[in-house]
Every structure is written in C-alpha cells, then in structure tokens.
Amino acid sequence: MSRSSEPLESDIQIQLVDYLRLVLSGRGVLFFSSPNEGMGEARSGGGLARMGKLKRMGLLPGVADLIFIKEGRAYFLELKRTKGKQSANQLIFEADAIRAGALYAVVYSFDDAVLKLMAWGIIS
C-alpha cells in the first residue's frame, strides 16, 4: 500500500476509539485522548499565546495519542503511519512514562493496536 493510500493516523485513531467504545463499555478500563494535536503548528500570535497558556495549564507536548488506565496501571499508545517516526517530544514522553512505571507502545495500524492492547490485557 502506498503511503498516500494508507489511512491517516487520525483515521486509525477514530476507528480504534469507535471499536474500543464498544468492547470496553462497562469493563473497568478508562481510556482517553490528550488534545495536544498540532502543538507545534501555532504560528500566529494568538496561537502562540493559546499554546503557552495550555502548557502553563499542564498540557504536555509529546503525550501519546491514547491513554489507558486499568487496575491502577497506566498504558500509553502512540499511533503512527507505516513509516511514521516519533517526534523528539514523543521520545522524551515515552522515556518519562516508562521511567514512571507505565507501559508504552508505538503501533502502526488498527490491527497492530488491537494486538498490543490484547497483549497488555486491556482487551481480550
């Protein structure tokens, strides 16, 4: 599949979230997304001011796309396209999350994400 015909990261995330809302309903797993998309894209004065305020409020650059909490343990899932690479901020966040005792994975497709979540025991 050519890169142009493969799904965007956002499309994979939407597909995964729709699926997880079905399979995790009432299962004692909390999952959510951190709204930090486009943090590096603020170019106008208003955008920079908003980004600065969000950072002061605790928004953290590089946070994984999906966060899961199950039985007191945190799991972070970063979604990428086939040849996608983590940003410097994402690599820093990954190291910090692992150092804090969380599990972290980078996945490259819907199926890859489902397999990782099964391996973690988030879904069966």
Where are these regions (language model features)?
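Catalytic phosphate/metal-binding cores of nucleic-acid and nucleotide-processing enzymes, i.e., regions
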Residues: 1-124
